[in-house]
Amino acid sequence: MEVIHGRPYCCRELEGADILSNTFYSNGLHTPYETTIRPTASEDRYQELRQALPQCRLRWGADREYGGMLPVSLPEEHRPKCEPPRLMSKGHQHYGFGGEIWPKKLPIEQYYYLTQNKKSDLYGNDSLLPKPPNSTVGEICSSYPIEHPYHTHISRGAMFPAFTSPKDLYTGVKARTQQPFPPTLPTKTYDSTILKTRGNPYRYELLDLPTDSKKKALTWPGQSVYYDFPKCVEKNKPVFYPKPPKTFAPNSSVTPWDTMTSAKDANIQRNLERSHWLTSYTHDFTGLGPMSPLELDDYREKELAELTGQIGFDPQPQEKFHPSLKPPRPLDGRIARLIQNQRPLEATVQIPPSCPDCTPRVLCAFHTFIPSSAEMMAMNDHLLSGLTHKNQNIEDKIKEEQRLLSTYALPSSYESKDMGSLFDLHSLPKITDTKKSDDLYWRQLDVKPLPIARSKSNHYIDYEPHKSTYRDPYAMCLNPVRLSKSNILQNKTDMADLTFDNYLRKPEFLGTDIESSDETRPLLNWISRAGVPKHHTNFRDFKNSFSRSMAHKRLHNSIQEEQKDLRDKLQCGMRHQFYGHNSHYFYN
């Protein structure tokens, strides 16, 4: 078929010059005039110019058929002197159109670019190979990938995946360069040589067992794909049915087996492989809940172990952090502070001193050497609770006060008077305003002096109305009378009798020499709440007095309004549907 040198520009379909290969344009020997120019304008501009190009309308609806207005194709010996006009030509009859083929007895140009079929890049006809005189055919020997014919029914990967990396320190490329090989690196089997003569019943095998320094590392062939060689003149006949990759390699490697680039990445990949060896029971039940994420990057620790000379340092991946049970929120108040070993909260209220002459920082001359009633009460409380062996500081303080009393020189107005005479003469109340002058302070008032309290041994104070301190740890004092009547102010008492035994006597003998009548109230009657016993609290009775059922009953009785039926579907107010269910099912 003759090649017609022309451009089918009359056909409305695209010629598809953009999708042809470069061979169509580079071959100037066969088709010198069909090297079309690729459009350099944009696609939108190209469509706009194509629509604006005036085209003649084909007759009989021929624009919808395969074909177009083409020049008449005639042989060279029958070509007329003048070029005949273009005629309607039909293309390849891919689908029959039911009409008569017109024109007749003329060669028809095949338009392969109108369909999905690919046109030959070199020739205008259907010949795919050049003729032997025009080309030389040579045999090419190159490897090509080959697989088993039943490879589609054979799994490519192994059932248990392998994480072996060429960058691994123990099984990778670096481990293969070290001899002797580590125990983690597999080696090839020994070579066996079989010596047997045909027809000889005796079989002789020669086994070569190399030493560790001469062993070779085991390699898995066909990690990526198998290549086979075609049958050539200088090559042997290839194996037609190769073995599938699974029979050789456990699994195909993702990365190529090249030189190691990062030992740290290989160590992380090995730890990742070992982390998959942990069972679900070990991962979920550690005693402290599920296992935390593992620390996969321990390359620094392994380097330090290698520098220090440790052999076989390959620990299991450890957890990044160990979970710890968080203690529950402690109770509020006194119990919480006791659990946390903290000081219990106390009100910091400064109690005014019992003596008007004393200040919180400076004591008067009388209480500087003689202990106050509060100190006396503290000493007796410690004695009654059986903890006298822990009060060495109090004993040392009292002994020091006794020593000071023995060496203290009284003023001139008290030189020839003892404690009894001092109480008789100076028992009148004084003006306690210390901001006044000393003359006003020492001036006596014109009032009747108080009766003198005498020591009588036949008087007895009843202790029945008061609880014992041994059974009630919340009591403030042993005897309310003891706070208001101190034994240091007893009449006819010498200073030499003021010993440690007088301070630390038993409670039943401490107040027997003191009268409890209203007429014999002592001078130290300004102590606040001296004769009033403290209210005894019982936390256990308060706890047992609470009843949950009674509290619910009082709560329901306090609600006087009529209870609403939650089953009523009201359109106003709060909603009654929760999670698709009526609130009646959640009521109590």
Curated annotation (Swiss-Prot):
Pfam families the record matches: SPMIP4-like (PF15093)
Keyword Transcription among UniProt keywords: no
Places the protein is found: Cytoplasm, Cytoskeleton, Microtubule organizing center, Centrosome; Cytoplasm, Cytoskeleton, Flagellum axoneme
Keywords, alphabetical: Cell projection, Cilium, Cytoplasm, Cytoskeleton, Flagellum, Isopeptide bond, Phosphoprotein, Ubl conjugation
Cross-link (Glycyl lysine isopeptide (Lys-Gly) (interchain with G-Cter in SUMO2)), chain numbering: 543
Residue numbers carrying Phosphothreonine: 219, 512
Sites bearing Phosphotyrosine, chain numbering: 441
InterPro entries referenced in this protein's UniProt entry, alphabetically: SPMIP4
Positions of modified residues (Phosphoserine): 224, 406, 421, 427, 437, 457, 484, 516, 545
Biological role stated in the UniProt entry: Microtubule inner protein (MIP) part of the dynein-decorated doublet microtubules (DMTs) in flagellum axoneme. May serve to reinforce and thus stabilize the microtubule structure in the sperm flagella.
The protein's name in its UniProt record: Sperm-associated microtubule inner protein 4
Gene from which this protein is expressed: Spmip4
